[in-house]
């Protein structure tokens, strides 16, 4: 027995048989050990060969395992070191069979033949030899890795035409032009290899599936009738190819099978760019170069699919590229997407067991097109439908909120009941009786609701079964029509089909007024999913939100004192956007806030973010003092290729990509380098910006606020001289025109001049600042009260028309917070105290009148 003349897989099988014998403590390696190893993999070569010969590999495997368990166990160093005479004879017979079959190596299938001869109850040698020839496709074993080349197409490919015949592919709607062009190229004499090129998600693979469906229906020219489209899995070809040359051998076997089929098989390689360089090692030939000769001669028909970016990999190899004919696949329009979704609707309805309304389909196409800008139609719209249906299905399969709330309440009462059982006083006994009565009432109510819910679920289960049967009947009708079994087709179409359709309709009708089961995916569900994905509120305005938007000025005034013009301008822009009236290609609003320091420009931006998004974190703050040099401008959109930091992306673009719905504050805009304004022009006009990676970032759902101190001296001077607001605004505008280019100023929605704060407004700000301090003290359970005189004292000290409200913060820190902190540290003010603050001759006076008991 010469193991050098065995294939790698056969040698490994013998080695594993030895390991098995050692593990089971058997003295010698016998036939059952080798059978157990060969039959371990259900899809393996031995399994397939025995099935083809008409044997039952499963029964054989169980028989050999029983035999193994009966073998005696031994101890010592000699365990599993010898072959039994019957196994040795079978292995020598395998070598004789190798010579008979004109092979160069003993392969796994040859081993199976030899073992089968030595095992009673298996098919004869001739039957096994016939199965072996069929499995090998008439080839002999000439290499050490020959097993991986048997039935290569079946092993490494997926037959799309078979899947289409079984109705397992989704219907392909439209795309007739592209399918016609692919057919046209396939019918050429040479270079008949179309490659579908398009953005990810536009439906390149679907076009090939559409062609497979047409071939099955016979809706193709004579030259393509009866052909098979096999999708080659590059991953399967590469997987497990441990030894050099094994990958090339597998691919060569695939190419040979396709060539031998004489045009019956059309190969399809998704992600075609993976062919370039696949299996490349030092001195090895990559897949692309192995395909070239067959492609050029027209012996092999290949359809490829790849994206625009990845097609560049193929363009690097002109000899490979010239063998392909590109077919460009454009993104479908919203209208075409709606047609595609209507065609797919039934598949998703059957899968999820829900109904998808037409309004949901239209919403999925329009909302995904408008708000999910980084992905392509129809893929993103299909994803929306799928997720919304999955969400509804999940809701249907879990307990309704109404029942859930009652059960939680019941559990709470049961816990309370157990605690009260230990108490003996009359009050507790009284309460216990009341609780038990309430628990009994709740139990009855829950049982009633559960019964109703179960009844509705039962109807739903029947509906899903009917939908599945309906789907199967439609598939059977298609199959019968293809096979010209017209009697069967008519029987199903005019007998079974209307009956099932009526059943589905009747069950759906029963659920229409259901209390717990909502069966239909609506546009509201789609809007909800879009909001989850993007953070952009696109769902219909709820009553509470309408109120909030109508009272937006009031909300903003809670934190920003005065500045009515600015607040009104911002609130109007937000209302226009949420009512759906804003220009869809521009940001929600773009404002330039001007005014002296400390009057609330930045505070308004923060307040707007907190009001709209319930958190100040939703504000993207770009401090323009960091962008004063020319080279710093690239940080906004990312460093160019080749520079350090290219991978990180831009500070502005990355922030907006992660939060497409936000307030962007460009603080101190006049300090920025002039080149920054060139970037801003694009954002303000088109609502988009391309970063250094070539990705388009969408700014259409952002509020852009720029703040500046330009013209502050003029504002103060105008107020001292008593100029009207309009004149101050015009004077400031003249200063702006000297500093900013007209095309920049012209793109802003509103230029708002903030007024300096008056004494009365500073007094209001005292209240706001004190509320923040009280909130901090509340954590220490200390309450703070200030007399009106104390508040006036702080406002008086903190008023400065030039510096706005900022001096007030310093006054509060100095006069109120610092003395209070000293008193807390000295133990004069403790947890639970009430501190009263008044004015004395030397400033503020603190008093702790009475301790509040904890």
From Swiss-Prot:
It is found in: Cytoplasm. SMART domains: AAA, ClpB_D2-small. Residues 3-147 form the Clp R domain. GO terms for biological process: cellular response to heat; protein refolding. Part of a stress-induced multi-chaperone system, it is involved in the recovery of the cell from heat-induced damage, in cooperation with DnaK, DnaJ and GrpE. Acts before DnaK, in the processing of protein aggregates. Protein binding stimulates the ATPase activity; ATP hydrolysis unfolds the denatured protein aggregates, which probably helps expose new hydrophobic binding sites on the surface of ClpB-bound aggregates, contributing to the solubilization and refolding of denatured protein aggregates by DnaK. Residues 6-71 are annotated as: Repeat 1. The keyword Coiled coil applies. It comes from Thermus thermophilus (strain ATCC BAA-163 / DSM 7039 / HB27). It comes from the Bacteria. ATP 1 binds at residues 198-205. Residues 332-535 are annotated as: Linker. The Clp repeat (R) domain probably functions as a substrate-discriminating domain, recruiting aggregated proteins to the ClpB hexamer and/or stabilizing bound proteins. The NBD2 domain is responsible for oligomerization, whereas the NBD1 domain stabilizes the hexamer probably in an ATP-dependent manner. The movement of the coiled-coil domain is essential for ClpB ability to rescue proteins from an aggregated state, probably by pulling apart large aggregated proteins, which are bound between the coiled-coils motifs of adjacent ClpB subunits in the functional hexamer. The keyword Cytoplasm applies. GO terms for molecular function: ATP binding; ATP hydrolysis activity. Residues 382-513 form a coiled coil. The gene is clpB. Belongs to the ClpA/ClpB family. This is Chaperone protein ClpB. CDD domains: AAA (cd00009), RecA-like_ClpB_Hsp104-like (cd19499). Residues 545-756 are annotated as: NBD2. The lineage of its organism: Bacteria, Thermotogati, Deinococcota, Deinococci, Thermales. ATP 2 binds at residues 595-602.
């Amino acid at each position: 027995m010469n193991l050098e003349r065995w294939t790698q897989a056969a040698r490994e099988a013998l080695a594993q048989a030895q390991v098995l014998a050692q593990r089971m403590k058997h003295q010698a390696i016998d036939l059952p050990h080798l059978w157990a190893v060969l039959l371990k993999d259900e899809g393996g070569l031995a399994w397939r060969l025995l099935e083809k010969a008409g044997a039952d590999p499963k029964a054989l495997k169980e028989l050999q395992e029983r035999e193994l368990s009966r073998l005696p166990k031994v101890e010592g160093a000699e365990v599993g070191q010898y072959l039994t005479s019957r196994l040795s004879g079978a292995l020598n017979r395998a070598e004789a069979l190798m010579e008979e079959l004109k092979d160069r190596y003993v392969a796994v299938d040859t081993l199976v033949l030899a073992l089968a001869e030595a095992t009673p109850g298996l098919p004869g040698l001739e039957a096994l030899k016939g199965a072996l020839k069929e499995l090998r496709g008439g080839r002999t074993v000439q290499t050490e890795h020959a097993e991986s080349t048997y039935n290569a197409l079946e092993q490494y490919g997926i037959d799309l035409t078979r899947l289409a015949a079984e109705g397992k592919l989704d219907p392909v709607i439209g795309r007739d032009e592209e399918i016609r062009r692919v057919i046209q190229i396939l019918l050429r004499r040479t270079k008949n290899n179309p490659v579908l090129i398009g953005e990810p998600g536009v439906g390149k693979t679907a076009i090939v599936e559409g062609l497979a469906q047409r071939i099955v229906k016979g809706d193709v020219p004579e030259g393509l009738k009866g052909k098979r489209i096999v999708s080659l899995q590059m991953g399967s070809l590469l997987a497990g190819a441990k030894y050099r040359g094994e990958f090339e051998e597998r691919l060569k076997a695939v190419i040979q099978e396709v060539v031998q089929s004489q045009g019956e098989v059309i190969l399809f390689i998704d992600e075609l760019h993976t062919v370039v360089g696949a299996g490349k090692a030092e001195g090895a030939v990559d897949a692309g170069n192995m395909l070239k000769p067959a492609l050029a001669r027209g012996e092999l028909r290949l359809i490829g699919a790849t994206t625009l970016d990845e097609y560049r990999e193929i363009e690097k190899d002109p000899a490979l590229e010239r063998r392909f004919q590109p077919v460009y696949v454009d993104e479908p329009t919203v209208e075409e997407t709606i047609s595609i979704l209507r065609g797919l609707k039934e598949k998703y309805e059957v899968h999820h067991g829900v109904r998808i309304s037409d309004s949901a389909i239209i919403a999925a196409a329009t909302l995904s097109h408008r708000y999910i800008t980084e992905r392509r139609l129809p893929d993103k719209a299909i994803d929306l439908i799928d997720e919304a249906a999955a969400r509804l299905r999940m809701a249907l399969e879990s307990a309704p909120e109404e029942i859930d709330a009652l059960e939680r309440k019941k559990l709470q009462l049961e816990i309370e009941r157990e605690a009260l059982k230990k108490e003996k006083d009359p009050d507790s006994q009284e309460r216990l009786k009341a609780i038990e009565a309430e628990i009994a009432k709740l139990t009855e109510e829950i049982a009633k609701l559960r019964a109703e819910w179960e009844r509705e679920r039962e109807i739903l289960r029947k509906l899903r079964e009917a939908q599945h049967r309906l789907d199967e009947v439609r598939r059977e009708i298609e199959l019968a029509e293809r096979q010209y079994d017209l009697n069967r087709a008519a029987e199903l179409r005019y007998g079974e089909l209307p009956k099932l359709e009526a059943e589905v309709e009747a069950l759906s009708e029963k659920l229409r007024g259901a209390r717990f089961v909502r069966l239909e995916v609506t546009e509201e569900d789609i809007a909800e999913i879009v909001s989850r994905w993007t953070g952009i509120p696109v769902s219909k305005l709820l009553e509470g939100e309408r109120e909030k938007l109508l009272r937006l000025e009031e909300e903003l005034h809670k934190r920003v004192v005065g500045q009515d013009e600015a607040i009104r301008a911002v609130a109007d822009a937000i209302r226009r956007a949420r009512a759906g009236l804003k220009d869809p290609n521009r940001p929600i609003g773009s404002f330039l806030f001007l005014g002296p320091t400390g009057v609330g420009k930045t505070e308004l931006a923060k307040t707007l973010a907190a009001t709209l998004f319930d958190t100040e974190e939703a504000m993207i703050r770009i401090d323009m003092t960091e962008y004063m040099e020319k080279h710093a401008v690239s940080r906004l959109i990312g460093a160019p290729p080749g520079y350090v930091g290219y991978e990180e992306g831009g500070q502005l673009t990355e922030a907006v990509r992660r939060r497409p719905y936000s307030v962007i504050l460009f603080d101190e805009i006049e300090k920025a380098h002039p080149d920054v304004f060139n970037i801003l022009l694009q954002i303000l006009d088109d609502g988009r910006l391309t970063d250094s990676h070539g990705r388009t970032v969408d700014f259409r759902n952002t509020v852009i606020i720029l703040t500046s101190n330009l013209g502050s001296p003029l504002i103060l001077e105008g107020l001292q001289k008593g100029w009207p607001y309009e004149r101050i605004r015009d004077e400031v505008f003249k200063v702006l025109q000297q500093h900013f280019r007209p095309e920049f100023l012209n793109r802003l929605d509103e230029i708002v001049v903030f007024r300096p704060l008056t004494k009365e407004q500073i007094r209001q700000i005292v209240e706001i600042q004190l509320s923040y301090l009280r909130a901090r003290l509340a954590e220490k359970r200390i309450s703070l009260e200030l007399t009106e005189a104390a508040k006036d004292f702080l406002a008086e000290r903190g008023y400065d028309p030039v510096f706005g409200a900022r001096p007030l913060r310093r006054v509060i820190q100095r006069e109120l917070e610092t003395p209070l902190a000293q008193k807390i540290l000295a133990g004069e003010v403790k947890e639970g105290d009430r501190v009263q603050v008044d004015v004395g001759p030397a400033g503020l006076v603190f008093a702790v009148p009475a301790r509040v008991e904890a």
